[in-house]
Amino acid sequence: MSQLMGIITRLQSLQETAEAANEPMQRYFEVNGEKICSVKYFEKNQTFELTVFQKGEKPNTYPFDNIDMVSIEIFELLQ
């Protein structure tokens, strides 16, 4: 399974968990133990929120309404 498919699988699991819990759920993505980004899924409006962590800077947050687009963004961040 490619890394991109692994990311999509994790995001689909995040969606399913959020739907069952009825509250926003969050997942972290790391490289060599360093947090690169986190993703929250909001069931109410069916959107993802990507937070990108950069050393020495304030985290940047980006909204996505498409699982494919947020998956590609995460994939690029992890490269």
Curated annotation (Swiss-Prot):
Cleaved signal peptide residues: 1-20
Keyword Disulfide bond: no
Glycosyltransferase is among the record's keywords: no
Keyword set, alphabetical order: Signal
Pfam families: DUF1797
Entries under InterPro entries matching the protein: YkuJ-like, YkuJ-like_sf
Protein name: Uncharacterized protein YkuJ
Record organism: Bacillus subtilis (strain 168)
Lineage of the species this protein comes from: Bacteria, Bacillati, Bacillota, Bacilli, Bacillales
The encoding gene: ykuJ
